[in-house]
Structures are given as structure tokens and as C-alpha cells.
Swiss-Prot record:
GO terms for cellular component: extracellular region. May have antifungic activity against D.coniospora. Its main location: secreted. Induction: Strongly up-regulated upon D.coniospora infection. It comes from Caenorhabditis elegans. Expressed in hypoderm. This is Neuropeptide-like protein 33. It is found in: Secreted. Residues 1-21 form the signal peptide. Belongs to the YARP (YGGW-amide related peptide) family. The keyword Secreted applies.
Length: 74
């Protein structure tokens, strides 16, 4: 049987992973690499890292440009 402490650690990491996927590193307008180098929000723009963040260009930042940025653009 899995120990309670191990289960709690796994649960904590799962929660952190979900939060990171939603908001990235740095809160509502943060995000790992979000909006790096362009757009109204500048460095760290966008609240949902995979959809709104990314690095450089586009109206809201984002590697691929597009209205809301994001690494692959939109």
C-alpha cells in the first residue's frame, strides 16, 4: 500500500502541474516565456502559458504571433 506521505507528495506535484499549465510561472500575467519581446503586455504577457504566452511578436506577444500570442501562434 502507498504511504500517506508519498501520496500527499504526488498530489502536491499534480496540483502544481495543473496550476502551472493554467497560469505559468508568475501569476495572471506571467507565464514561462510569455509575451517575451512584444505586444501590449510585453515580457510575461498572457495568463495561460500554452495559449496566451510564448516569446516575441504579435498583438499580445507569442512566438507565432496571432491575436493572443502563444508559442505556436493563433
Amino acid at each position: 500500500m502507498i504511504s500517506t506521505s508519498l501520496l500527499l507528495v504526488v498530489l502536491l506535484f499534480a496540483i502544481l502541474a495543473i496550476v502551472d499549465a493554467q497560469w505559468g510561472y508568475g501569476g495572471p500575467y506571467g507565464g514561462y516565456g510569455g509575451g517575451y519581446g512584444g505586444g501590449p503586455w510585453g515580457y510575461g504577457g498572457g495568463w495561460r502559458r500554452r495559449h496566451w504566452g510564448g516569446y516575441g511578436g504579435g498583438p499580445w506577444g507569442g512566438y507565432g504571433g496571432g491575436p493572443w500570442g502563444g508559442y505556436y501562434g493563433k
